[in-house]
Amino acid sequence: MADRVLVIGSGGREHALAWKLAQSPHVKQVFVAPGNAGTANSGKISNSAVSVSNHAALAQFCRDQEIRLVVVGPEVPLAAGIVDDLTAAGVRCFGPTARAAQLESSKSFTKSFLDRHGIPTARWKSFTDPKAACSFINSANFPALVVKASGLAAGKGVIVASNKEEACKAVNDIMQDKTFGTAGETVVVEELLEGEEVSCLCFTDGVTIAPMPPAQDHKRLKDGDEGPNTGGMGAYSPAPQISKDLLLKIRETVLQKTLDGMRKEGIPYLGVLYAGLMLTKDGPKVLEFNCRFGDPECQVILPLLKSDLYEVMQAVINKKLSSSMPIWYEDSAAVTVVMASEGYPGTYPKGLEITGLSKAKELGLEVFHAGTALKDGKVVTNGGRVLTVTAIKEDLMTALQEANKGVAAINFKGSIYRKDIGYRAIAFLSQSRGLTYKNSGVDIAAGNILVQKIKPLAAATSRSGCNAELGGFAGLFDLKAAGYKDPILVSGTDGVGTKLKIAQVCKKHDTIGQDLVAMCVNDILAQGAEPLFFLDYFACGKLDVEVAQGVIAGIAEACQKAGCALLGGETAEMPGMYPPGEYDLAGFAVGAVERGQMLPQLERIADGDVVIGVASSGVHSNGYSLVRRIVEKSSLDFSSQVGVSGDQTLGDLLLTPTKIYSKTLLPVLRSGHVKAYAHITGGGLLENIPRVLPDSFGVVLDALSWKIPEIFCWLHKEGNLSEEEMARTFNCGIGAVLVVQKELAQQVLKDVQKHEAAWLIGKVVPLQKGSAHVKVHNLLQALQANRSLSVHSHIQGKIQTNKVKVAVLISGTGTNLEALINSTKKPTSFAEIVLVVSNKAGVEGLRKAERAGIPTRVIDHKQYGSRTEFDSAVDRVLEEFSVELICLAGFMRILSGPFVKKWEGKILNIHPSLLPSFKGANAHKLVLEAGVRVTGCTVHFVAEEVDAGAIIFQEAVPVKIGDTVETLSERVKEAEHRAFPAALQLVASGAVQVGEAGKICWK
């Protein structure tokens, strides 16, 4: 049976949505509210006069009309919670919740979110004070010329200034002259990026994303991108500037990362996500997010959709998008041209007759109405952007020509439109018709850019014997200049292994270079050699300059730590050899040792010699195939928070770089006191120590003599590994061992301990026939002992308990709110503020929350007939945000009995006296009248009787001679700012609960 659908909105986007939905065999009728002339009585499509701002009335309309799907076009209803309210009323609605829609409705929230999740964007800062904003513009070390109203401003709240004076004027226009009203109470000032702007949209069910063909909008009013900024004068799709590889990168580094980040923050995002991007020389960077289809992008993207839009949207709502991925027409291009009223984007006339619409249709074009209306049976203008003419052809040039023919056929007085929509794409295509090396996948220009970026990094590693200058055919090293008399050259080569896989998954490329250098230079130390120079090999399928620069910067920094020069290297771009986003590394180190100082000195090693163990920094660079398998089988992933303060991920911990020992151990090795040095690398303790021993000797080690890092304890437990497997695969906390004479052991140990953690861990013993070269005693006990060293184990069990989600209810300035925000931002906090609710609009507390990137909702108590109705509205929002605790911070409403009962033991309030004394609203006045010498504040659970709940925390404040209500109030407020966060921490941690009979229960 076919369904009815309701589309919310009145523009060209909504006409296009209705047009596409009406093509579905599952749909029998499409209502558009309020709609326009194009959606009035057009086949399956008709307009509705239902109020879209009254969500209760809208929900009733949907029930009465048996609406099976509501599709929200514009951003304002999304920010107002239309999806939340309709969904709560049992109406299926396509689009994000109000909380998720903050990605568009609060630019301050969005920029903070992007920074939190490492998604590339312009440098920025938000302000509520215009003077501070202008000071930032004038002092920033980058062009801070983009000024944005943080809130919704109908797509016009962004000013791109040409100089600092213009930027400051924009700030004052927005904040003082209220150009965009309340949307400009907070402004974001950000870096002016250079590049080409594109739009990348996707469908998403919160987990899976389905990218749409990339598009490009044209914001300026006139040809050649001249004139004022508008809501958009035309668009085209697909944008050929975005290659398949680049689109894949955008999908992974922007779209998927955004959805994953929202989900991790407890804000699942469903609907359409629109990323406005700048294609900079450093890669794509996010300019903005929209939480719906763009207008006019929608009018060029939907005509390219081969699939049933109704089915796709239902799959999104059902969270089954992966089983209903949309299919797009491959060999087609779409161009849409906007026709606007004379005077737009300023004031413009209305009611002008539009003719020629049927001629455009006869040309095979789609005309999507926007600012149109019906008057006396005629179509007339009723807005700034009046309509869009869309052509779908086999290529962009033809589509633009056809769209312009349609525009020429349509007429209304004073119409304005652009004739150059898609000019950037046409220029791009005309430059890239011939087959090139770059077309084949090798970008020589990108390689040259990389060389220029890394030249100064290599130059910084210069040392005696060579100047590290890249770009030649080979590098030179002068041993005599380095101070050598009779040297032996020593070389070593190595890679990083599958630790690279973790770096690539975590997109952390800045430390893997140290692993590469360490693996090579630590090896040649086994011959007693000083590392002189290093060469690297970086191989990939597609060169990402930013990634490669990060890796090589890490290599250069590591060379400085090792004391060797980065003399050269090879960057190999080989299309088809590696999957997108993957690369491989290899390194080659050359060192030297004077002929008489070479190691190991096998003939000197004797029974009773002592083994000194030098601490590793962690797993180093071996055993990662096993590590990855253990993580896959565990309950954790690489993004799981670990550490005492939860400020590190498991991926970060596993990517701790390998220690470089050359500078710290070389003086000891040259002292003549060390008989052998072994680098504990692949093969662990069992395989590496025998490499520097005579065949007739082995070693016995005591694992209880050194500290084993807890990462090994976790791997042992989680992987159910045997002692032998641990010792044969991992370094178990020992990165290198030295063999020294027993009588010199303490002296050598002290010398090593000046720079590294080290222990006496064993001794050399004669090897019995058939015996193992290395025996490690007490390894199991050491692993178990170290695993229980601390309650706050780095890796044990559930590494960091999930923070309790808190809502703060306010009515005013939010001074206590600010204290709560500051305390919950600390890594040690057990609480996280996920929502601030005010019963009054425009109060300072809301602005404080927005600056902190915390979602806000205004629920005006005056709009409800009773306390119970108001509390029910609050309760629905709390459930939407999965709130677990409530803090009342200057909330000037008495909560109803049913609400208090539902949230019993979950609501905290603060009172400005030491309860049970001086209850009520005038506590300070009562204190002064009573003549008491001590007052204070009390944090308590809320009960039905005012100020009568169980007391959690109190702080005393002296009453001074001459105190007034004002002076006493200020002193008590300071105590409140300490007491409220302390009480919240007690409750959120579970240390304090409400027990039987409403009494406090301490755990």
UniProtKB/Swiss-Prot annotation:
<dbReference type="GO" id="GO:0006164">
    <property type="term" value="P:purine nucleotide biosynthetic process"/>
</dbReference>
<dbReference type="InterPro" id="IPR016188">
    <property type="entry name" value="PurM-like_N"/>
</dbReference>
<keyword id="KW-0067">ATP-binding</keyword>
<feature type="binding site">
    <location>
        <position position="197"/>
    </location>
    <ligand>
        <name>ATP</name>
    </ligand>
</feature>
<feature type="binding site">
    <location>
        <position position="288"/>
    </location>
    <ligand>
        <name>Mg(2+)</name>
    </ligand>
</feature>
<comment type="similarity">
    <text>In the N-terminal section; belongs to the GARS family.</text>
</comment>
<dbReference type="GO" id="GO:0005524">
    <property type="term" value="F:ATP binding"/>
</dbReference>
<comment type="similarity">
    <text>In the central section; belongs to the AIR synthase family.</text>
</comment>
<dbReference type="InterPro" id="IPR011054">
    <property type="entry name" value="Rudment_hybrid_motif"/>
</dbReference>
<dbReference type="GO" id="GO:0004641">
    <property type="term" value="F:phosphoribosylformylglycinamidine cyclo-ligase activity"/>
</dbReference>
<dbReference type="InterPro" id="IPR036676">
    <property type="entry name" value="PurM-like_C_sf"/>
</dbReference>
<feature type="binding site">
    <location>
        <position position="909"/>
    </location>
    <ligand>
        <name>(6R)-10-formyltetrahydrofolate</name>
    </ligand>
</feature>
<dbReference type="InterPro" id="IPR020559">
    <property type="entry name" value="PRibGlycinamide_synth_CS"/>
</dbReference>
<dbReference type="GO" id="GO:0005829">
    <property type="term" value="C:cytosol"/>
</dbReference>
<dbReference type="InterPro" id="IPR020562">
    <property type="entry name" value="PRibGlycinamide_synth_N"/>
</dbReference>
<feature type="region of interest" description="GART domain">
    <location>
        <begin position="806"/>
        <end position="1003"/>
    </location>
</feature>
<feature type="region of interest" description="Disordered">
    <location>
        <begin position="214"/>
        <end position="235"/>
    </location>
</feature>
<dbReference type="InterPro" id="IPR004607">
    <property type="entry name" value="GART"/>
</dbReference>
<dbReference type="GO" id="GO:0004637">
    <property type="term" value="F:phosphoribosylamine-glycine ligase activity"/>
</dbReference>
<dbReference type="Pfam" id="PF01071">
    <property type="entry name" value="GARS_A"/>
</dbReference>
<feature type="binding site">
    <location>
        <begin position="943"/>
        <end position="947"/>
    </location>
    <ligand>
        <name>(6R)-10-formyltetrahydrofolate</name>
    </ligand>
</feature>
<dbReference type="InterPro" id="IPR002376">
    <property type="entry name" value="Formyl_transf_N"/>
</dbReference>
<feature type="binding site">
    <location>
        <begin position="814"/>
        <end position="816"/>
    </location>
    <ligand>
        <name>N(1)-(5-phospho-beta-D-ribosyl)glycinamide</name>
    </ligand>
</feature>
<keyword id="KW-0436">Ligase</keyword>
<feature type="domain" description="ATP-grasp">
    <location>
        <begin position="111"/>
        <end position="318"/>
    </location>
</feature>
<comment type="subunit">
    <text>Homodimer.</text>
</comment>
<dbReference type="InterPro" id="IPR001555">
    <property type="entry name" value="GART_AS"/>
</dbReference>
<dbReference type="Pfam" id="PF02843">
    <property type="entry name" value="GARS_C"/>
</dbReference>
<dbReference type="InterPro" id="IPR020560">
    <property type="entry name" value="PRibGlycinamide_synth_C-dom"/>
</dbReference>
<dbReference type="InterPro" id="IPR020561">
    <property type="entry name" value="PRibGlycinamid_synth_ATP-grasp"/>
</dbReference>
<dbReference type="InterPro" id="IPR004733">
    <property type="entry name" value="PurM_cligase"/>
</dbReference>
<keyword id="KW-0547">Nucleotide-binding</keyword>
<dbReference type="InterPro" id="IPR016185">
    <property type="entry name" value="PreATP-grasp_dom_sf"/>
</dbReference>
<feature type="binding site">
    <location>
        <position position="290"/>
    </location>
    <ligand>
        <name>Mg(2+)</name>
    </ligand>
</feature>
<comment type="function">
    <text>Trifunctional enzyme that catalyzes three distinct reactions as part of the 'de novo' inosine monophosphate biosynthetic pathway.</text>
</comment>
<dbReference type="Pfam" id="PF00551">
    <property type="entry name" value="Formyl_trans_N"/>
</dbReference>
<dbReference type="Pfam" id="PF02844">
    <property type="entry name" value="GARS_N"/>
</dbReference>
<dbReference type="GO" id="GO:0046872">
    <property type="term" value="F:metal ion binding"/>
</dbReference>
<feature type="region of interest" description="AIRS domain">
    <location>
        <begin position="434"/>
        <end position="805"/>
    </location>
</feature>
<keyword id="KW-0511">Multifunctional enzyme</keyword>
<comment type="pathway">
    <text>Purine metabolism; IMP biosynthesis via de novo pathway; N(1)-(5-phospho-D-ribosyl)glycinamide from 5-phospho-alpha-D-ribose 1-diphosphate: step 2/2.</text>
</comment>
<dbReference type="GO" id="GO:0006189">
    <property type="term" value="P:'de novo' IMP biosynthetic process"/>
</dbReference>
